[in-house]
């Protein structure tokens, strides 16, 4: 019984670490999009894992005036700054199976604040073969007032 409790505790700690990684990666992405501007997804493919109009990546201008892109590569969300080397922002234990991004409100005079609908789905796998599926949807609105 003691070994079962220890094993359950180990699984819970591993799972918590993976969940924290997903939370950190997606919150960082959302924060950067919220404080950025000039959203575009023209350079990215349309994804078949979501409805029409969604893309697998997004580019924008950060508050530091850098060109930033987030996109799905294999099973990892990548971040690229100013055309440099793309870096994964999700841990290897997190397998992203879909990243769907839809940009709304970027047309001039549409009276809609630019925003991005983001849907992320995947699997979290711990070292103990504990696996859990997740789907997250969030709407990110640009802070800079649209003209």
Model-inferred region functions:
Residues 23, 34, 78-79, 143:
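Short, cationic motifs built from Arg/Lys/His that form the positively charged side of catalytic pockets
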Residues 85-92, 96-102, 113-147:
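Low-complexity, S/T/G/P-rich flexible repeat/linker segments used as non-globular hinges
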Residues 1-30:
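Aliphatic-rich helix starts adjacent to a transmembrane/signal segment
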